[in-house]
């Protein structure tokens, strides 16, 4: 056997060290200031997540716990803001106090398990947990939090779409990573009253895509009676508004008495009440210090943190994954495939976008209407099969009839090769998607002449392209909205600067006028003092002459 055909020595070693283990994704959601960051650090028993306005100032990629290894540092995976800047990465600036932060979603990838470099015995590779922690920032800090629920729901739905597109491919990626969220912890503000409107809306929206566990934070701020009543209020609101949270239900057909007792105990603790802290004592435990003493956050008498850790990483980890896969994802998958398979042939009018990316040329129309009315946009949006009288209702008829074709020709001539290539690629993609959806229509798929293998191939090609096309359109629409909001904000700043400049000019004019008035008044006072001095001298002279005459 020749040397060239001999396999490398480390070939099997690489196969053995291939990534194995459990993939587990958790979402921490809730209003700002409820302790999500502190909980994440306490959950992993390390300080790798910085608090607000501390981003970039701490070593977020360094873990003090040998059992926790940061694979990918924290990154922004999605955000939506009226100001166009993610609040998570922005520094503290009092000048931005009047701006709404929007919502930012971050992701951190970690590896939980034994560290072989620490001299510990090698553990089973299947026990390693590849943990993805998703966190939300900015909820509850906006005048309108509807964009927060929409952004979180859109992110969760996108993860389902990615898995669905991968499953329907003929050739799958062997290194595909599942990013679906298996459990979401929703942090409730410790008001003592119950759920708020934003809590109900958010938990309802995300419960379609993941298991939701409500969490009460700062449990040490309640007495035992107050905490019991707060739990009852929350569960009453959950039943009243039909919020589908994850419940530890007891199966009457289950023969495992230990499991039944465990679920009963966990159901009585819902929602879990926890305490978090950034302070460690001399033994390395997380504690909270008070004037009257020190308490441990893992104390079962005052906090459910220890029980919650066991639920998340022990007893119910696989159940969360199974529920996400077999119930939530399957419902979404069947609904999505039905909508794609039953889609009729899409005409050219529905695939064309009605707006282009904003630019400085249409800045004025963007500020006033939020739409783009430039000649280039009109030429791009105009279709060959669109009658002229349909367009004349929105635009000036005489200008369009006289100059429409000329402007379109000029734009085609002046358009750069890059833009022309981009338009051609976009047109090809739209034609491809249109043809795929046509082939996936019921009339085409139910044809008796079509082989079964061809039907499966058409379905496998349809879903990924359709899902990707929908995501691209959603991203483009989002970018256009952000650009429009930024343009409006820029216009407001321009008007504010112009107003301040006008005020400065008026102030300068007033100061100059006061100076002139001051100089003229000083001259008048000097003249008056001179005249009075002359009168005084005259008086003295008259008195002297009178006195001399008497003598």
Swiss-Prot record:
<keyword id="KW-0175">Coiled coil</keyword>
<dbReference type="GO" id="GO:0000920">
    <property type="term" value="P:septum digestion after cytokinesis"/>
</dbReference>
<feature type="cross-link" description="Glycyl lysine isopeptide (Lys-Gly) (interchain with G-Cter in SUMO)">
    <location>
        <position position="426"/>
    </location>
</feature>
<keyword id="KW-0342">GTP-binding</keyword>
<feature type="modified residue" description="Phosphoserine">
    <location>
        <position position="447"/>
    </location>
</feature>
<dbReference type="GO" id="GO:0000082">
    <property type="term" value="P:G1/S transition of mitotic cell cycle"/>
</dbReference>
<dbReference type="GO" id="GO:0005829">
    <property type="term" value="C:cytosol"/>
</dbReference>
<feature type="modified residue" description="Phosphoserine">
    <location>
        <position position="519"/>
    </location>
</feature>
<dbReference type="GO" id="GO:0032186">
    <property type="term" value="P:cellular bud neck septin ring organization"/>
</dbReference>
<feature type="coiled-coil region">
    <location>
        <begin position="418"/>
        <end position="518"/>
    </location>
</feature>
<feature type="modified residue" description="Phosphothreonine">
    <location>
        <position position="539"/>
    </location>
</feature>
<dbReference type="GO" id="GO:1903475">
    <property type="term" value="P:mitotic actomyosin contractile ring assembly"/>
</dbReference>
<feature type="modified residue" description="Phosphoserine">
    <location>
        <position position="545"/>
    </location>
</feature>
<feature type="modified residue" description="N-acetylserine">
    <location>
        <position position="2"/>
    </location>
</feature>
<feature type="region of interest" description="G1 motif">
    <location>
        <begin position="30"/>
        <end position="37"/>
    </location>
</feature>
<feature type="domain" description="Septin-type G">
    <location>
        <begin position="20"/>
        <end position="339"/>
    </location>
</feature>
<dbReference type="Pfam" id="PF00735">
    <property type="entry name" value="Septin"/>
</dbReference>
<dbReference type="InterPro" id="IPR030379">
    <property type="entry name" value="G_SEPTIN_dom"/>
</dbReference>
<comment type="function">
    <text>Septins are GTPases involved in cytokinesis that assemble early in the cell cycle as a patch at the incipient bud site and form a ring approximately 15 minutes before bud emergence, which transforms into an hour-glass shaped collar of cortical filaments that spans both sides of the mother-bud neck. This collar persists until just before cytokinesis, when it splits into two rings that occupy opposite sides of the neck. The septins at the bud neck serve as a structural scaffold that recruits different components involved in diverse processes at specific stages during the cell cycle.</text>
</comment>
<dbReference type="GO" id="GO:0005628">
    <property type="term" value="C:prospore membrane"/>
</dbReference>
<feature type="modified residue" description="Phosphoserine">
    <location>
        <position position="548"/>
    </location>
</feature>
<feature type="modified residue" description="Phosphoserine">
    <location>
        <position position="460"/>
    </location>
</feature>
<dbReference type="GO" id="GO:0000921">
    <property type="term" value="P:septin ring assembly"/>
</dbReference>
<dbReference type="GO" id="GO:0005200">
    <property type="term" value="F:structural constituent of cytoskeleton"/>
</dbReference>
<protein>
    <recommendedName>
        <fullName>Seventh homolog of septin 1</fullName>
    </recommendedName>
</protein>
<keyword id="KW-0472">Membrane</keyword>
<feature type="modified residue" description="Phosphoserine">
    <location>
        <position position="520"/>
    </location>
</feature>
<dbReference type="GO" id="GO:0061640">
    <property type="term" value="P:cytoskeleton-dependent cytokinesis"/>
</dbReference>
<dbReference type="GO" id="GO:0000917">
    <property type="term" value="P:division septum assembly"/>
</dbReference>
<dbReference type="InterPro" id="IPR016491">
    <property type="entry name" value="Septin"/>
</dbReference>
<dbReference type="GO" id="GO:0060090">
    <property type="term" value="F:molecular adaptor activity"/>
</dbReference>
<dbReference type="GO" id="GO:0003924">
    <property type="term" value="F:GTPase activity"/>
</dbReference>
<feature type="binding site">
    <location>
        <position position="138"/>
    </location>
    <ligand>
        <name>GTP</name>
    </ligand>
</feature>
<dbReference type="GO" id="GO:0010458">
    <property type="term" value="P:exit from mitosis"/>
</dbReference>
<dbReference type="GO" id="GO:0005619">
    <property type="term" value="C:ascospore wall"/>
</dbReference>
<feature type="compositionally biased region" description="Low complexity">
    <location>
        <begin position="519"/>
        <end position="532"/>
    </location>
</feature>
<feature type="binding site">
    <location>
        <begin position="218"/>
        <end position="226"/>
    </location>
    <ligand>
        <name>GTP</name>
    </ligand>
</feature>
<keyword id="KW-0131">Cell cycle</keyword>
<feature type="binding site">
    <location>
        <position position="288"/>
    </location>
    <ligand>
        <name>GTP</name>
    </ligand>
</feature>
<keyword id="KW-0007">Acetylation</keyword>
<feature type="modified residue" description="Phosphoserine">
    <location>
        <position position="408"/>
    </location>
</feature>
<feature type="region of interest" description="G3 motif">
    <location>
        <begin position="135"/>
        <end position="138"/>
    </location>
</feature>
């Amino acid at each position: 056997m020749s040397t060239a055909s001999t396999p490398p020595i480390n070939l099997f070693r690489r196969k053995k060290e291939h990534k194995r283990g459990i993939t587990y994704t958790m979402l921490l959601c809730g209003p700002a200031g409820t302790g999500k960051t502190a909980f994440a650090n306490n959950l992993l028993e390390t300080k790798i997540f910085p608090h607000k306005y501390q981003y970039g100032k701490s070593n977020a990629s360094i873990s003090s716990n040998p059992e926790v290894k940061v694979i990918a540092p924290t990154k922004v995976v999605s955000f939506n803001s009226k100001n166009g800047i993610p609040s998570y990465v922005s520094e503290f600036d009092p000048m931005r106090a009047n701006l709404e932060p929007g919502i930012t979603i971050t992701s951190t990838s970690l590896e939980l398990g034994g560290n072989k470099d620490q001299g510990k015995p090698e553990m089973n590779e299947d026990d390693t947990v590849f943990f993805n922690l998703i966190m939300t920032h900015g909820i509850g800090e906006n005048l309108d939090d509807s964009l927060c629920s929409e952004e979180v729901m859109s992110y969760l739905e996108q993860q389902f779409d990615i898995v669905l597109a991968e499953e329907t491919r003929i050739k799958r990626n062997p290194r595909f990573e599942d990013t679906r969220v298996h459990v979401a912890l929703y942090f409730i503000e410790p008001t003592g009253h119950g759920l708020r409107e934003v809590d109900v809306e958010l938990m309802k929206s995300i419960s379609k895509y993941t298991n939701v566990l409500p969490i009460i934070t700062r449990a040490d701020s309640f007495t035992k009676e107050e905490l019991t009543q707060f739990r009852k209020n929350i569960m009453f609101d959950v039943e009243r508004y039909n919020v589908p949270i994850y419940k530890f239900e007891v199966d009457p057909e289950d023969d495992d008495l230990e499991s039944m007792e465990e679920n009963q105990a966990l159901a009585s603790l819902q929602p879990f009440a926890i305490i978090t802290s950034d302070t460690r004592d001399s033994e390395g435990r997380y504690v909270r210090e008070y004037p009257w003493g020190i308490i441990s956050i893992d104390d079962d008498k005052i906090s459910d943190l220890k029980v919650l850790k066991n639920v998340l990483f022990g007893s119910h980890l696989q159940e969360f994954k199974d529920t996400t896969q077999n119930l939530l994802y399957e419902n979404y998958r069947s609904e999505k495939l039905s909508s794609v398979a039953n889609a009729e042939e899409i005409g050219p009018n529905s695939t064309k976008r009605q707006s282009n990316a904003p630019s400085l040329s249409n800045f004025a129309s963007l500020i006033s209407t939020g739409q783009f009315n430039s000649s280039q946009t009109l030429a791009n949006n105009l279709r060959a099969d669109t009658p002229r009288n349909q367009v004349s209702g929105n635009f000036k008829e005489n200008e369009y009839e006289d100059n429409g074709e000329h402007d379109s020709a000029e734009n085609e001539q002046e358009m750069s090769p890059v833009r022309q290539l981009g338009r051609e690629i976009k047109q090809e993609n739209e034609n491809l998607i249109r043809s795929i959806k046509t082939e996936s229509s019921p009339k085409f798929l139910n044809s008796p002449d079509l082989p079964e293998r061809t039907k499966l191939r058409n379905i496998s090609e349809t879903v990924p392209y359709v899902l990707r096309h929908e995501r691209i359109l959603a991203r483009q629409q989002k970018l256009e909205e952000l650009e429009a909001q930024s343009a409006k904000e820029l216009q407001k700043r321009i008007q504010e600067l112009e107003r301040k400049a006008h005020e400065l000019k008026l102030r300068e004019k007033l100061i100059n006028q006061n100076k002139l008035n001051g100089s003229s008044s000083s001259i008048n006072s000097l003249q008056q003092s001179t005249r009075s001095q002359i009168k005084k001298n005259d008086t003295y002279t008259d008195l002297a002459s009178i006195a001399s005459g008497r003598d």
